[in-house]
Amino acid sequence: MHEHQRFDEAAATWDDDPGHEKRQVAVARAIKEAVTLSPRMRVIDVGGGTGRLSILLADLVGSVVVTDPSAGMVRVAQERIEVAGLSDRLRAVQADLTTDRLDGAYDVAWSSMAFHHVQDLDGLLRSVAGLLVDGGRLAIADLDEDPDGAFHADKVDFEGHHGFDRQRLAEQLTRAGFTDVSFSDATTILKDDREFGLFLCTATKAPSPTGRAPASR
């Protein structure tokens, strides 16, 4: 089964899992501690799923575009946004940022547990860098390196990354045009009686000759 299809089928009940809610609350807290947010900021959520992270942080920024390759996730995200009364500032868009081009210039990009599903990570990082203004901030929450693949052991057709080595990810971010790369521990995930670490990585879009200005703070 293709991953997009799996997420399409899981979307309707995804937020029913208390573990997912606990994780997103922890990631939202970590982002608030690591990134200065303001009401004029334009945000893009990369692989935002049901939009829960963006809904949790919505009151701290100006607008958010929640992107996800899964049509099912995007449909649920838009429903959640409307129920939360946030449709004037948040919207969900089906997009795979490794292949699809989006318009706009964003002050912040955030993501939770999405990057490890992306095979072309370098391509995604370059795409996100291209969407950010100079000085724009990136916040990635994802799995620490899981060498034996235990976290995804129940998915025999998983083709993503088994977590990330922090130093290697920092090098990829630098090559993609980011500076000030920093890591912190965000939370842990308990699965099959094992704990898996979740980091928050933040970075800053380096200035470019054709860069775009950030929103007024």
Walk through the language-model features, giving the residues of each.
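A conserved beta-strand element that flanks and buttresses the S-adenosyl-L-methionine
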Residues: 110
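Short catalytic micro-motifs in class I SAM-dependent methyltransferases
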Residues: 113-114
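Class I SAM-dependent methyltransferase SAM/SAH-binding core
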Residues: 44-99
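Short glycine-centered segments of the SAM/dcSAM-binding site in methyltransferase folds
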Residues: 42, 136-137
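Helix-to-beta-strand junctions that scaffold the AdoMet/dcAdoMet cofactor pocket
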Residues: 86, 118-119, 132-133
